[in-house]
């Protein structure tokens, strides 16, 4: 079963909109109980990138905050053409199909959804947030993203 292994420790940056991860935290990948993905100390996030007009319904932080930070890290990896190996604690424990392969935006979005389910974010919220990231990705990068 997927789960986060560590607490999330952050500090607010001077701009008041971004946060720095103070301690590396990890997430067990769904398909392999030994495979851990990491968000490194020093990573900068904005939590959930929700337009301000919707903050009363879905604020940038909430039960899904760790999921949003993991998603941000995977999206940065996608944009920088990083391999799954780069976000794994131990690349040899990754499923073979992910080893030495670039992260796809679709996979980052799927893990966002999976991680929200793992920490029991309610189904409606999961669907709304997942739909939002998919629509954004399709408009920004096309259907192959």
Q: Each predicted region: which residue ranges?
A:
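Extended terminal accessory/targeting regions
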Residues: 1-145
């Amino acid at each position: 079963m997927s789960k986060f292994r560590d607490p999330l420790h952050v500090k607010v940056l001077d701009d008041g909109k971004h946060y720095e991860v103070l301690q590396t935290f990890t997430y067990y990948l769904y398909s392999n109980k030994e495979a851990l993905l990491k968000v490194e100390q020093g990573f900068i996030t904005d939590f959930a990138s929700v337009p301000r007009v919707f903050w009363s319904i879905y604020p940038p932080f909430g039960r899904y905050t760790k999921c949003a930070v993991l998603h941000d890290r995977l999206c940065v990896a996608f944009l920088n053409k990083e391999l799954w190996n780069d976000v794994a604690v131990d690349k040899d424990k990754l499923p073979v199909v992910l080893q030495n392969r670039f992260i796809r935006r679709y996979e980052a979005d799927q893990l966002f959804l999976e991680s929200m389910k793992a920490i029991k974010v309610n189904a409606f919220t999961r669907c709304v947030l997942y739909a939002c990231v998919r629509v954004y990705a399709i408009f920004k990068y096309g259907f192959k993203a």
